[in-house]
Amino acid sequence: MQTLNYLVIILIIAGVISVLAFTPLVRKLKIRFYLIQVLAIVLFVYVFFGRQIIYLFPDVYGQNSQSSQNLDSLRLSRIFLLDLCPFFAVIAPVFVFLKQKKISGVLAVFGLFGALVTLFGELIFTPVNEQDIVNFIFVGTGNNQIYFMMHFLSLLVSLAIILWDNCFSLISFFYIHVFALIYFSYVALMVSVFKGQITGNTTGILASDWTNGEYKNVATFLNLSNSDPQLVFIVGFSLSYVAILLMTLFANIPTFMEMKKDKIFIKKENLIRKDLELLA
């Protein structure tokens, strides 16, 4: 790992600490929902105009000059949001503005997990030199437009939603399964519709995903053979499932605390009622 990679790690940790540090203050403010919405707008605008629009209007941005199967596959993945992190960055900000907060909470769990895996499973290990550090952080390189900043902002927005908003309850455990079923079914359907045209960037649906990028590094970390993508797929998805459940459990801690307070309150009420009955 190079010296500049540690700078990237410091930036990530500083962002996380900032969200955590402001959490007690923000939760006391009536405008906390607006603060989340501002962060969500920044994420959406950055990703849409810095990344999505290039694939929606490739002729305007000169992206059709060198057409290839890999590039065509990437376009389809980008346009239809078949990768979880771009999906979160574009779709989650929309749900932040809805009165029903449960959906944004569920998306935040997946967004947080995806951002952490990519940031710490791939990006902090990407070789960076002094000439490219600014582009790496703010612009991206090659076809990985704003790759770091998209995941960094997704990390901050996800944390803000989870910590600042009261959008979780016990039913969230049910909702994360519903979302996973719908989203992965959607990705599998699009892969089937564009059979042979989409070769990767499908949130792990295709085996090629598990031999590249953060998946490859995670497989190396878990000491799994990249020559056996099925094993990487099974272990990776299993660990991902457990991690998402634990994140949902963590997000529900305030709910559990409220339930405990309610039980104590009800118990006190019952004791008072019994005392009054004895006095009567």
Swiss-Prot record:
It is a multi-pass membrane protein. It comes from the Bacteria. GO terms for cellular component: plasma membrane. It is found in: Cell membrane. Coiled coil: none annotated. Keywords: Cell membrane, Membrane, Transmembrane, Transmembrane helix. The chain crosses the membrane at residues 6-26, 38-58, 79-99, 105-125, 144-164, 171-191, 231-251. This is Uncharacterized protein MG135. The lineage of its organism: Bacteria, Bacillati, Mycoplasmatota, Mycoplasmoidales, Mycoplasmoidaceae.
